[in-house]
């Protein structure tokens, strides 16, 4: 073990992209960062899409970025986790799903699938629903679908194409029928507006609502009368309540995001529920949810929360070394909670420094330097104490000012950051330590869209990874990802990489 002190500096929202009028990173005068980017040995790493556990083409973000960096592996987000389980057929043998099928068969009941009909990828995805329908069909399960129309994470009338798709799928595969449908305004409230949930409940359980024969035509008629997806009033298929949730039936909620599914689930399972008068409450043979909605529910979950162990922070602590996490308020949770794999408690030997972000401005383009000077001052004091083997620091400016869409202010932010980067690099070299410069995702390098309009969102661009040890750049391999940083740090120390840390060591022997 050769534990040289390492300072990991994360420039939040600093991606790499070609020169353009919207690339504030190229427009700014940043001699220190530019010099490091030009060094031989540095590399670009992926910070978006599947490389960080998100769906292909999805931009990275600070939470996911720090989670991957700290975990030293690809941490699949819920949607991608389910996608992967479908691709490798793990969903087909999911024990909770199979147990639900068993309960349905033993009770001679039906399985009701409830969730958002959408490809928005925020609460659900239609491909997850279609996979569930296919698997249920293979097990000869009678399925009744109660879709909720989106209109928030998709266009206000995009629901028609999703309804056509799912009707076509149900028809071609003979995998089920639609029992009712309504807008998410009713079925997915999260503010205890129980009068909305009651309308969805009454349609799903009691068959109360506007009765229709054709879901596609009914949706078209709703549009014609001024309703849009989010606000589609509950419709019940057919003239009776035969396809409503009955005794001995089972229910599966297929949303993977919890917050807007909890209220309707609670109406099904809580004996002391008092949100509204439920009327007849069906005695279910089983109920399950795609992910953990609430620990208090105590019901089966197809994809439980992953317990991320052997993170970089945990390994450093187990080695008996001291570590420091430091950031200003806007990014403090990222270098602590997310970097530690979703752990709030400090590790033994871990210290934290929180620097207050400016409160005297409404938006950070009015103060683009934010608190970077104080963060740097306190960081250098800690570094020069020679107390810590690992310091993790986040500089928030590129991301937070980039989000304002103000290119001029973003240039000022980057120039303030560059000054601090130069100071930090010099201090690390003086202590013969290792300085690692990277970012969690892109933003400030792509501030205009293709039409020249302001773009305030993150990007899918790669980010830099530069390691300078004792004043000299280390040679790093290409085609890495954020999850490779932690294994690389352990390799610099010549420490064995735990099996849980499945990222790659990017140190090159060349």
UniProtKB/Swiss-Prot annotation:
Record text on cofactor binding: Binds 2 manganese ions per subunit.
Pathway where this protein functions: Carbohydrate degradation; glycolysis; pyruvate from D-glyceraldehyde 3-phosphate: step 3/5
EC code: 5.4.2.12
Catalytic site: 62
Biological processes annotated in GO: glucose catabolic process; glycolytic process
Binding-site residues, substrate: 123, 152-153, 184, 190, 257-260, 331
Cofactors: Mn(2+)
Amino acids binding Mn(2+) 1: 399, 403, 458
GO cellular component entries: cytosol
Domain of life of the native organism: Bacteria
Pfam families: iPGM_N, Metalloenzyme
Keywords assigned: Glycolysis, Isomerase, Manganese, Metal-binding
Catalytic activities: (2R)-2-phosphoglycerate = (2R)-3-phosphoglycerate
InterPro entries linked: Alkaline_phosphatase_core_sf, BPG-indep_PGM_N, Metalloenzyme, PGAM_B_sf, Pgm_bpd_ind
Binding sites annotated in the UniProt record for Mn(2+) 2: 12, 62, 440-441
Molecular function as annotated in GO: manganese ion binding; phosphoglycerate mutase activity
UniProt-listed CDD domains: iPGM
Family: Belongs to the BPG-independent phosphoglycerate mutase family.
Summary of subunit composition and partner proteins: Monomer.
Its biological purpose: Catalyzes the interconversion of 2-phosphoglycerate and 3-phosphoglycerate.
Protein name as annotated: 2,3-bisphosphoglycerate-independent phosphoglycerate mutase
Gene: gpmI
């Amino acid at each position: 073990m050769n534990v040289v002190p390492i300072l990991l500096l994360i420039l939040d929202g600093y991606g790499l992209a070609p020169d353009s009028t919207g690339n504030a990173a190229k427009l700014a005068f940043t001699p220190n960062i530019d010099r490091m980017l030009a060094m031989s040995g540095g590399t670009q790493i992926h910070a978006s899409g599947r490389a960080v556990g998100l769906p292909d083409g999805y931009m990275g973000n600070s939470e996911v970025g720090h989670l991957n960096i700290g975990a030293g592996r690809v941490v699949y987000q819920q949607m991608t986790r389910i996608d992967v389980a479908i691709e490798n057929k793990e969903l087909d043998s999911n024990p909770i799903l199979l147990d639900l099928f068993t309960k349905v068969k033993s009770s001679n009941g039906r399985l009701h699938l409830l969730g958002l009909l959408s490809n928005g990828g925020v609460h659900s995805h239609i491909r997850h629903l279609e996979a569930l329908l296919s698997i249920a069909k293979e097990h000869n399960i009678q399925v009744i679908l109660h879709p909720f129309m989106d209109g928030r994470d998709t266009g206000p009338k995009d629901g028609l194409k999703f309804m056509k798709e799912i009707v076509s799928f149900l028809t071609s595969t003979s995998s089920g029928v639609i029992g009712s449908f309504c807008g998410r305004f009713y079925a997915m409230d999260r503010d205890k507006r129980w009068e909305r949930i009651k309308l969805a409940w009454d349609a799903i359980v009691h068959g109360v609502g506007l009765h229709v024969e054709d879901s596609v035509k009914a949706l078209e008629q709703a549009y014609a009368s001024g309703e849009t997806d989010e606000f589609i009033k509950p419709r019940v298929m057919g003239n009776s309540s035969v396809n409503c949730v009955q005794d001995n039936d089972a229910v599966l909620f297929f949303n993977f995001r919890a917050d807007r599914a909890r209220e309707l689930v609670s109406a099904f399972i809580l004996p002391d529920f008092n949100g509204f008068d439920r009327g007849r409450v069906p005695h279910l043979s089983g109920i399950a949810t795609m992910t953990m909605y609430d620990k208090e529910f105590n019901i089966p979950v197809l994809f439980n929360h992953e317990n991320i162990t052997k993170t970089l922070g945990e390994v450093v602590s187990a080695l008996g070394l001291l570590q420091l996490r430091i950031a200003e308020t806007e990014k403090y949770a990222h270098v602590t909670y997310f970097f530690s794999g979703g752990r709030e408690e400090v590790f033994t030997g871990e210290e934290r420094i929180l620097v207050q972000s400016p409160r005297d401005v409404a938006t950070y383009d009015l103060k683009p330097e934010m608190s970077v000077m104080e963060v740097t001052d306190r960081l250098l004091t800690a570094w020069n104490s020679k107390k810590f083997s690992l310091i993790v620091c986040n500089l928030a400016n590129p991301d937070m000012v980039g989000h304002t869409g103000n290119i001029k202010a973003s240039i000022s932010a980057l120039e303030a950051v560059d000054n601090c980067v130069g100071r930090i690099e010099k201090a690390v070299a003086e202590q013969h330590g290792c300085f690692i410069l990277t970012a969690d995702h892109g933003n400030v390098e792509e501030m205009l869209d293709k039409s020249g309009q302001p773009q305030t969102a993150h990007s899918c661009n790669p980010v830099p990874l530069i390691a300078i040890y004792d004043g000299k750049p280390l040679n790093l391999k290409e085609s890495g990802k954020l999850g490779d940083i932690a294994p690389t740090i352990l390799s610099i120390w010549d420490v064995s990489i735990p099996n849980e840390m499945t990222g790659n060591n990017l140190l090159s022997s060349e």
